[in-house]
Amino acid sequence: PVLGGETMNTAKFIELAGPAAEGHVASTPGAALASRPKGREFAERYRARFQQEIGLYAPYFYDAVMVVASAMERAGTTVPSKVLPVLRNIRHAGITADIAFDNTGELQQAQLSVFKVQNGKWVLLQ
């Protein structure tokens, strides 16, 4: 088995690798969508609207846009020099994680999920 990152954690990997995918492990930033109430809702809406599985980075992009939009709304402007100080105070219950920043702008609580291919499917390891 191989340990990989989020780019390996796809249905396409299992499709291409076939039975050889069994036992491979992949890490993904954030929480598994199915483990977060808003994540499940996002996945359902995405599939209904686009008639396909969620793209690899779509959930992270969605969270990033929501955080920046919230900061712009609170700042009352889109001017970066006025949005940035507000951004550091944002607390957002996202679909991939609870998002908050420290004084240097880093995530306060980075999260990682680990999956393993079992019976031809990615399964979240506890």
Task: Give residue spans per PLM region.
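Extracytosolic ligand-binding ectodomains
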Residues: 1-126
